[in-house]
């Protein structure tokens, strides 16, 4: 919003942003072989159905789950799957929703007194609002701060100081992404000319909300002493192991013709055994990096869930076996939210992001990537949007604004 819409852009007369709307389908005119997108049907926040008509083109940008879902709800997709849920197939496009790719990661958690950042320090650095009830010790209503006990008053003052430090100097813990270091390398299992692995260094552990809400893991199953490990002053670090060129492919499949029903997201993680082989190699490299950490800043022993440690005879300080690493990957891998390739270029869209077989319809998001990138997808997704805008301008004879270089 801040980068692309805020200010003059959102005030333009040719831009209307409709909040709370849910696109239900692309409106198609014509017979097979002569299909054209003429608008999008959507439901408003009030539940009313409306149509936004297109003078020139419709551009979908709903992501690697949403874009193929909208295409299929519009009748563009694998014929047998559409007919199975009662959607009239307007264009048999077998690859819509297929070839789903994503990055997986496994976090290796290490106690790191004096090195890692505690969750308490993280909360303090995010300012007073992050410390308010119900989750924090400060009152929910700032008006009640006048009667704070001395200790809580000092806590609030320090939180304000840290936010001010960041706002005025750009320094301080709040300026950190927490993902403080990264490494890319080749495991040697794939193409030697490209990297297939990534390591990340996360300078704090996870709190209980992240364990339960994001990772879907019960901390009492991962730790012998969850209260100690998740205490606000516990200092930990996480080394994230990411294979970045997975071979396994999943798919997006409609569960019904109702646009408000979530599609079936079949990730098929580790469906190709090669991906597990690479994950073990990446974990092994991560362990090697930690084992060779500079002496004054050594991390504690790797924390392994008690049940897996007992099953594999692992004791703190041991070198984990490959079988243990496989089990850790199977039980504790989690998504990096890098879903791509479900409307991929070459089989669903052409080199200018136009949907094959339909005039006036493009897709511009991570779903058009032929394969997932060998690293984070955020910058690539932004680039796709920028390039799509450029292509639209070129194809419709709209002059592009000159790029003004910033002064050196």
Annotate each PLM feature.
Residues 1-10, 18-20:
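Short beta-strand to alpha-helix junction loop
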Residues 240, 247-334, 368, 373:
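Helix-rich C-terminal "cap"/substrate-channel and partner-interaction subdomain
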Residues 241-256, 342-362:
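FAD-binding beta-loop-beta segment adjacent to the flavin cofactor pocket
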């Amino acid at each position: 919003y801040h980068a692309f819409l805020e200010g003059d852009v959102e005030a333009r007369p040719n831009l209307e942003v409709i909040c709370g709307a849910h696109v239900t389908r692309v409106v198609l005119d014509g017979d097979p072989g002569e299909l054209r997108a003429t608008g999008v049907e959507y439901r408003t926040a009030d539940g009313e159905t409306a149509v936004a008509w297109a003078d020139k083109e419709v551009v979908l940008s709903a992501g690697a789950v949403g874009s193929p879902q909208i295409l299929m709800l519009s009748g563009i997709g694998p014929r047998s799957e559409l007919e199975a849920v009662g959607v009239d197939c307007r264009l048999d496009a077998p690859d819509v929703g297929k070839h789903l790719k994503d990055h997986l990661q496994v976090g290796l958690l290490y106690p790191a007194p004096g090195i890692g950042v505690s969750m308490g320090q993280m909360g303090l650095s995010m300012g007073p609002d992050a410390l308010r009830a119900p989750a924090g010790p400060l009152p929910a209503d700032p008006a009640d701060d006048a009667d704070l006990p001395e200790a809580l008053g000092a806590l609030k003052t320090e939180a304000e100081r840290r936010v001010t430090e960041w706002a005025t100097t750009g320094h301080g813990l709040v300026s950190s992404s927490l993902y403080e270091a990264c490494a890319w390398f080749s495991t040697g299992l794939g193409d030697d000319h490209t990297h297939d692995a990534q390591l990340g260094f996360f300078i704090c552990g996870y709190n209980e909300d992240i364990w339960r809400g994001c990772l879907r893991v019960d901390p009492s199953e991962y730790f012998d002493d969850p209260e100690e490990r998740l205490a606000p002053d516990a200092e930990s670090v996480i080394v994230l192991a990411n294979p970045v060129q997975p071979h396994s492919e999943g798919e997006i499949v409609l569960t019904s013709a109702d646009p408000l029903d979530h599609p079936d997201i079949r990730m098929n993680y580790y469906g190709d055994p090669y991906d597990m082989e690479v994950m073990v190699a990446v974990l092994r490299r991560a362990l090697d990096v930690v084992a060779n950490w500079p002496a004054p800043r050594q991390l504690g022993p790797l924390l392994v869930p008690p049940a897996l440690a007992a099953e594999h005879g692992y004791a703190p300080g041991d070198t984990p076996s490959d079988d243990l690493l496989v089990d850790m990957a199977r039980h504790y891998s989690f998504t990096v939210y890098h879903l791509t390739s479900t409307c991929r270029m070459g089989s669903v869209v052409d080199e200018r992001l136009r949907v094959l077989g339909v005039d006036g319809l493009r897709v511009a998001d991570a779903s058009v990537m032929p394969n997932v990138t060998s690293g984070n997808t955020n910058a690539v997704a932004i680039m796709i949007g920028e390039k799509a805008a450029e292509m639209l301008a070129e194809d419709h004879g709209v002059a592009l604004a000159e790029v003004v270089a910033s002064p050196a």
